[in-house]
């Protein structure tokens, strides 16, 4: 029995190898560069004070110090987009390897960048031309204040959009500004290509000259994500085959593919919008011979902080500035893995992009430079948001109703099952939680993992403990829909290379570790291995909001709860138009689902299984 446990633990850790301007869609099987022009706002604005010398100003009455949760520009503009999902078999990937199947958005493995100005409305028509998979698109990090039904979490805020031409419209306000991304919350679409980036233009905490645009970084696998999920439910997470930077990557075995290139203008300051769109891998990032200055974390503007390297967890975003003040030449932008294999691994020993100064020869850098410092799989916890928020730590007392233990069950079928508070989430696609809200039915299924929050405009505290009584624990990037949360505290960091010892929250000693005055605020934060994380958010946004690990294999395995915030206010706030669209989409899904002969094998929030010659083989429960 002990031998079986250690074998399972080794597998889990991976210690055992096993209306905007859109670019033209790529031809099937022909990879191309994924580029978007984000050097200017969507359109020139009249009398704008937002200049290279003064990025803090945005428009009369709105600047970097404006609290966007209180005041947002009323632009009167709606940005419209259409996203069409398709499947392609035997697709030639960017590293020269043919993949069995990919799912594309407007013909790309990265869909178009959704671009808007602060205060605009965004309207996206999603057309599902997949063969048998439903879909839902989540607009990661956008609060959806007053538009909970547009959050894109199937089984929670909507039924899936049925395949073979089903469609629905998402409409929401760009209340925040900064950098984010969108992705499927159904099936294997997240890992198989249904992903894209979001830019909401707005003020910044430091001046800069050039906006380089989005820079998504992702782990990349030759196997379909559906197959990988089944493998990780019964074994360890495999290393990625390579890492893609803005859609490009090198094959470490054959040399096929190419490095992504970013051009720097000598003497200028550049803004780079870095996004981790991975399914599993976290990255330690370093631009050789340069520093990066952080100006935003997860769409929260922060006071400038300069770093030599940067840890980026799955789902996180950082806006940074880079000064092109070095010798004209070519420099590696490296991604490494710290904190042991539980933090990520790749078969590519040198995942990198090339940052090239204008005037430099078109050659690869010759100096790999110094390795990035190992952050031990933990994110920065000392950033200072520009708009301050404070929370009284005296209001927190750990109790069973605000403590969420994360645990792993070993030895069943599947081998690994993730639980929060002793329960593994399993949503019902046919009856999302908002249906219960509309019907005033509070008999939620136990497996829906619903936590009801009835308080109004009050700080709510949540202590997440990582396997506090179990034998095994790894870090988790915890993501909350509908809110930014305050990182009030976490268990003490361990030095790099030193495994985290078991550390449960102890009020007698750990209350002194909590930060009440303007702590880090974001929507994805790392839960330390063997440790704890204390977050707080204010109950000011009625909705059904998922809180989950953003490692696709873990949320697929059940690591999620959903906060049902102020259900009565939520029900009263639904517009008739939203309810009509919701009902029409659910009716279309319910008509389709009984005709689909293929299985639902996981939580319903991420990936599903492909088997044999039937890549969408789902068994209905």
UniProtKB/Swiss-Prot annotation:
Glycoprotein in keyword set: yes
UniProt main location, coarse: secreted
Pfam family, one: Cu-oxidase_2
Organism this protein belongs to: Podospora anserina (Pleurage anserina)
Gene name in the database record: LAC2
CC per GO annotation: extracellular region
GO molecular function list: copper ion binding; hydroquinone:oxygen oxidoreductase activity
InterPro entries assigned to the protein according to its UniProt record, in alphabetical order: Cu-oxidase-like_N, Cu-oxidase_2nd, Cu-oxidase_C, Cu-oxidase_fam, Cu_oxidase_CS, Cu_oxidase_Cu_BS, Cupredoxin
Subcellular location: Secreted
Name of this protein: Laccase-2
Cofactor: record remark: Binds 4 Cu cations per monomer.
Purpose of the protein: Probably involved in lignin degradation and in the detoxification of lignin-derived products in its natural habitat (herbivorous dung), which is rich in lignin of grasses and straw. Probably involved in melanin synthesis and in perithecia development.
Propeptide: 24-48, 606-621
EC numbers: 1.10.3.2
